[in-house]
Each structure stands twice: as structure tokens, then as C-alpha cells.
Amino acid sequence: LATDGDADRIGLFDSKGNFIDSHHIILLLIHYLVKYKNQTGKVVTAFSTTEKISKLCKHYGLEQSTTKIGFKYITGYILNEDVLLGGEESGGIAIKGHIPERDGIWMGLIIWEFMAKTGKTLEELIQEVYDIVGAFKYDRNDLHITEELKQGVLAKCKEGISAFGDYSVLRSEDLDGFKYHFENDQWLLIRASGTEPVLRVYAESKDQESVNKLLKTATETVLNF
């Protein structure tokens, strides 16, 4: 179990030393709270989190809402609605019955409880989730570019993009940044950071090789607008 300096964000490592990101942790928590603890409620996640959350919520009949990036938007839901879990890509997660804010230590304890009660390894529990939503990989590139180039990329995104190299856009969203959906459940998000002078490019696909290819193609495309 790993947290950041003030312990509001969480990361995990499995028995082989592989890093388990926040997307997988969110999925594990939903799976545990619903299947094993019979809890209910809405799931609220930020725009940059995995699309697999929607699949898991649909599987369990849970309502889901997507917010702009920033935990304050998730907290608003927690304070006003019956929220089972709220989570963001950076590792901040909150669950029902605790505080309406991120707590990495508490999330770690819940995961350990999950492992202890089932007698299963983290890898085995993740496989349970994969059996429902399918395996996936997620990654992000932070592009340190000039403000002029960054604004140029965002302007091009606003105009509309139909393809990134060989990846044809099926549909797009602009809740917070610009998200592009492709075939085979692949997607890409381009967003200017709200805390650093960078342009972030997020991607999700079936495996790491596919994610790397999508990120490479997207990065080359935006840098040549």
C-alpha cells in the first residue's frame, strides 16, 4: 500500500511488485462493496477515469455520474446524494459511511479487508473484475509545451477532430477537456492541466502495447496541428 504525503491518495502493488492504479482500485472497491457487502448507492467519478466503471455499474445496476476533474465536484454529490463511491484518476477515493473526502489509508484498509475475507490475492480479485468488464490498460503523457502551442491544440480540439492517424473518432465529449472514443472500447482525452503548465494526454485500451500506440499517435497528431 502506498499513499501520497498527506495520505489522501492511494496506490497498491500486487504480490509480484506490479503497480495497481486508481482505476483498478475503484473497480475493486465497487465490486467488493456491492457483491460482498450488499451495499448500494450512486457511483461518482471524474471525467478522466476508466470507462470500465460504467460497465461495472451497469452490471450491478448502479447509477453513475461523471464530473469535471477535481474532487470538490465529487464531494458535492456525496454531501447531497446517496453515494456509494466517489473517485478520481489521481488516486483520491471516498466511500459511503466514511468522510466526504479522499482517504488513502481507509481505502487501503478496505482493500486489505477484501483480501482477508476472501483469502484471495490482489491479482485474483482483479481477475474477478476483469471477468465482468474485461482487461484493460490506462496511461498518460504529460506534454511540456509552450503556452502558444497548448492553446493551438485546444483550439483545434474545439473545432472538431475526426481522426488521430488511423484511429477514426466514433464520438467525442467535452465535459472537461476533449475525450475521443474509438472502436474496441478505446478512448483518448486531451486536457490542459489545472495545476501545471502541461497538456495531458490520457488513453485507455485493451493492453499496454495498444495504449502506447494510441498515445504515440495522439501525441504526434497534436504536436503537428
Go through the PLM ranges and name each one:
Residues Y36-F225:
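Phosphate-binding and adjacent anionic-ligand microenvironments
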